[in-house]
């Protein structure tokens, strides 16, 4: 049973990571249009704004599910310390990015660049976390 839950956690987290890469692509598309003073792709803006909070929630759920799974399987929280630390870092950055995004109110907002930089870090950490997770699974 635990074996299937581990695979389920991996698949869920991989799906969330793919959705975050799509979210990042939307954000980059919006940013490029804004910086080149081209017309803003309003459909992309709407999708990016609407999906952001959902993805933050899914990222948090993936972390929580993984944490519970490790506790059930091993009885220890720190059994996979690097995977735990990277997952926790992702969650903290997700929350930070979400909170920063709430402060973006105008086109020249100083919060756009920190939002962008945190998003890049999140994506890089998801890649690293995925490799760590595959090492744990296999």
Identify the residue ranges that each predicted region occupies.
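Membrane-embedded alpha-helical bundles that constitute the cytochrome b-like, heme-associated redox core
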Residues: 1-138
């Amino acid at each position: 049973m635990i074996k299937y839950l581990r695979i389920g956690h991996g698949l869920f987290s991989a799906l969330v990571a793919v959705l975050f890469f799509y979210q990042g692509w939307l954000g980059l598309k919006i940013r490029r249009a804004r910086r080149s003073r081209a017309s803003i792709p309003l459909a992309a803006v709407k999708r990016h704004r609407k999906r952001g909070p959902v993805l933050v929630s899914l990222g948090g759920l993936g972390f929580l599910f993984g944490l519970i799974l490790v506790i059930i399987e091993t009885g220890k929280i720190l059994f996979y310390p690097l995977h735990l630390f990277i997952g926790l870092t992702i969650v903290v950055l997700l929350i930070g990015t979400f909170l920063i995004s709430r402060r973006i109110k105008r086109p020249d907002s100083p919060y756009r660049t920190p939002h962008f930089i945190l998003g890049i870090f999140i994506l890089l950490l998801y890649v690293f976390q995925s490799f760590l997770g595959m090492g744990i699974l296999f």
